[in-house]
Amino acid sequence: MLSPKRTKFRKQHRGRMKGKSCRGNRICFGRYALQALEPTWITARQIEAGRRAITRYARRGGKIWVRIFPDKPVTLRPTETRMGSGKGSPEYWVAVVKPGRILYEMGGVSETVARAAISIAASKMPIRSQFIRLEI
């Protein structure tokens, strides 16, 4: 599972996801990509599930790039705990994704293989997304 090696602070505010993605919204490495169409938090487990799905489908051919990284800690309080006494402890990590952000990129395979592999990964994501290809 992806998570930062070390962070400056253990806990973070939740924040707001407004507007479109201004960075990471163009294909940089591969020829095909999965692009987010909605704002959300994507957990490290969901990122890993999508990566595994693409890798399994593509087998040996091709290369995969994961373009998002879970760098935001999400805290949870223990169940049946009374309110107060501070913020809960960090439980898992999420990547903040805005519309337009590239989630995965793929190269070295045919478009049919890439489309099928990326659609499997898209079904594992909690948002609507689209398959895009590099226009040369």
UniProtKB/Swiss-Prot annotation:
It is found in: Plastid, Chloroplast. Its main location: plastid. GO terms for molecular function: rRNA binding; structural constituent of ribosome. InterPro entries: Ribosomal_uL16, Ribosomal_uL16_bact-type, Ribosomal_uL16_CS, Ribosomal_uL16_dom, Ribosomal_uL16_sf. The keyword Cell membrane does not apply. It comes from the Eukaryota. The keyword Transferase does not apply. GO terms for biological process: mitochondrial translation. Belongs to the universal ribosomal protein uL16 family. This is Large ribosomal subunit protein uL16c. It comes from Brachypodium distachyon (Purple false brome).
